[in-house]
């Protein structure tokens, strides 16, 4: 009798482990691998500005006080200079930042038009993060360090850049937003 019970327990543990693994894989399929790589083609379609708002609300008071989105003059006029890529690569986008320029804080979410361009957009945001580090390196080392600790992550057809006091929390907020948008 003990043998049967232990076999049942082992089977139950195996089933539970399998269910947990499947749920992790299902989430990863919507947001690429845990390294931020692009996904298998799942497409989410929500306004990038909604993602930015959700993230900035989740991270709280970070010095970010302005948000612009694709279609607004501040976004359209500055996109190529800030990110070094053509606006034609994205179908939507928004970024939030500290308008005083006193901090490196920035949250950017871009919806990429073609899956083939995700890596190019991701690289552009990584370059932007490095540029922010250089911008503050000479006179505000704490802001340069913040930029150095920033996160760039691809989820579905979106690419995220988070530079703030807790970039891991910003990344988590982005992933949570995208997970809810995928459902």
PLM regions and their residue ranges:
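Bacterial N-terminal signal peptides that target proteins for export
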Residues: 3-18
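Second-shell loop/turn segments in exported
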Residues: 106-114, 158-164
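Short amphipathic alpha-helices in soluble, non-transmembrane regions
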Residues: 121-128, 173-179
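A short, solvent-exposed beta-edge/loop patch
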Residues: 142-183
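An anionic, turn-rich surface loop/hairpin at beta-sheet edges
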Residues: 127-150
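C-terminal motif of bacterial Sec signal peptides marking the signal peptidase cleavage site
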Residues: 26-30
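Bacterial signal peptide processing site
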Residues: 32-35
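Short, compositionally biased low-complexity segments enriched in polar/charged residues
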Residues: 68-104, 116-121, 147
């Amino acid at each position: 009798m003990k043998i049967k019970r232990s076999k049942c327990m082992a089977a139950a543990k195996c089933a539970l482990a399998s269910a947990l693994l499947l749920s992790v894989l299902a989430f990863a399929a919507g947001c690429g691998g845990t390294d931020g790589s692009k996904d298998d083609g799942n497409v989410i379609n929500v306004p990038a500005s909604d993602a930015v708002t959700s993230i900035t609300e989740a991270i709280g008071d970070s010095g970010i006080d302005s948000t612009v989105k694709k279609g607004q003059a501040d976004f359209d006029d500055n996109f190529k200079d800030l990110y070094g890529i053509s606006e034609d690569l994205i179908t939507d986008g928004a970024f939030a930042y500290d308008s005083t320029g006193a901090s490196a804080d920035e949250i950017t979410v871009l919806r990429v038009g073609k899956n083939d361009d995700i890596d190019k957009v991701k690289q552009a945001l990584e370059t932007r993060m490095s540029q922010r580090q250089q911008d503050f390196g000479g006179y505000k080392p704490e802001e340069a360090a913040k930029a150095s600790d920033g996160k760039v992550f691809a989820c579905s057809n979106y690419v995220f850049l988070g530079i703030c006091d807790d970039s891991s929390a910003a990344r988590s907020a982005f992933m949570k937003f995208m997970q809810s948008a995928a459902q």
